[in-house]
């Protein structure tokens, strides 16, 4: 997937699930299933319920995403 094809949107973590999966509520009110990107996992950045995050989504599957940034 080319970098130009991704959709970046901000959201809030609503629920923590097993295997580093999270339910994220986007700014537009939709809820998606998101996983943690490799760099966040490698640097041991903790993501908790209530955190604001940036999510990358593919235009082909708008129900799943990848968390790429956690706001302080």
Swiss-Prot record:
Transmembrane segments: none annotated. Residues 1-72 form the S1-like domain. GO terms for cellular component: cytosol. InterPro entries: NA-bd_OB-fold, RNA-binding_domain_S1_IF1, S1_domain, TIF_IF1. One of its GO terms (molecular function) is translation initiation factor activity. Keywords: Cytoplasm, Initiation factor, Protein biosynthesis, RNA-binding, rRNA-binding. SUPFAM superfamilies: Nucleic acid-binding proteins. Belongs to the IF-1 family. PANTHER family: TRANSLATION INITIATION FACTOR IF-1, CHLOROPLASTIC. One of the essential components for the initiation of protein synthesis. Stabilizes the binding of IF-2 and IF-3 on the 30S subunit to which N-formylmethionyl-tRNA(fMet) subsequently binds. Helps modulate mRNA selection, yielding the 30S pre-initiation complex (PIC). Upon addition of the 50S ribosomal subunit IF-1, IF-2 and IF-3 are released leaving the mature 70S translation initiation complex. This is Translation initiation factor IF-1.
